[in-house]
A protein has these predicted regions:
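Conserved acetyl-CoA-binding loop-helix of GNAT-fold acetyltransferases
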Residues: 107, 114-128, 153
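Short secondary-structure transition/capping segments
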Residues: 150-151, 170-174
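Conserved acetyl-CoA binding element of GNAT-fold acetyltransferases
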Residues: 89-91, 95-114, 168
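Conserved GNAT acetyl-CoA-binding A-motif
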Residues: 128-143
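Haloarchaeal acidic low-complexity proteome signature biased toward cell-envelope/secretome components but also
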Residues: 1-84, 95-101, 131, 158-161, ...
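Conserved active-site alpha-helix within GNAT-family acetyltransferase domains
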Residues: 142-165
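Short secondary-structure capping micro-motifs at structural edges
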Residues: 75, 87-92, 124-127
């Protein structure tokens, strides 16, 4: 896999993703944010087309590439960015320029929950780049328990704040992971538990993580 920073917000990079495979694909063509990606080569792509294995991050998808909807007339596969496995957009926080705000994070549908931790790995990569760029903190707002749990693996913790869109805000210092506590982790999960319209997978996940401690950091972030 290759991690690549396509540019910061001032460079106005854009990326055209296959909207059939990536959530929020339209957010990557509008500009105004930085973009980073994980790419895979052809061999990895072939392996990735094998059935996904469910992990504790979110329900694995089993999308068959051959079953994708047909593209409309005038749109060709070649117009989409090739070999992208995950992508992220980001820009300075509107109220604090020392904080980098992650705007959108998306993983190709057949790779979600396959155990490779592509989303957390891409966030960790971006955090290292943000440190070199002089940011003090990095933040993200999430709307589901799976993403919330995954962000704890790269040193984010719940801030006890929500956005106007009912998303939970997590952040961490740039230089080191935030100190996670069981009580703080569970407070965020409790917010999701109180919501209506949860999927069966979300209900099961929240039940399984009742009284659980925060997940371990990715191995690359753990202190020796």
């Amino acid at each position: 896999m290759e991690f690549a920073l396509l540019g910061w917000a001032e460079a106005d990079p854009t990326l055209r993703l296959d909207y059939r495979r990536f959530s929020y694909a339209g957010k990557f063509v509008t500009g105004g944010t930085g973009v980073a990606v994980i790419r895979g080569d052809a061999a990895e792509r072939a392996a990735d087309d094998a059935p996904a294995v469910e992990s504790d991050d979110e329900t694995a998808a089993d999308t068959d590439p051959e079953s994708l909807a047909s593209l409309p007339d005038g749109v060709a596969e070649s117009e989409f960015a090739d070999e992208v496995l995950a992508a992220i957009t980001f820009s300075p926080d509107r109220t604090d320029s020392s904080t980098l705000k992650i705007r959108y994070l998306t993983v190709r549908d057949d790779l979600r929950g396959d155990g490779k931790q592509l989303g957390p790995q891409l966030v960790a990569f971006l955090t290292s780049k943000a440190a070199a760029a002089g940011y003090d903190r990095i933040a993200i707002a999430v709307n589901n328990a799976f993403s919330y749990h995954a962000l704890y693996k790269v040193g984010f913790t719940y801030t006890d704040r929500e956005t106007g869109l009912a998303e939970l805000v997590l952040d961490r210092p740039i230089g080191e992971p935030a100190v996670a506590s069981q009580s703080g982790y569970q407070r965020g999960l409790d917010v999701f538990r109180e919501r209506e319209g949860l999927s069966a997978a979300e209900i099961e996940f929240l039940s399984d993580h009742s009284n659980a401690v925060p997940p371990r950091l990715l191995s690359s972030l753990r202190q020796s």
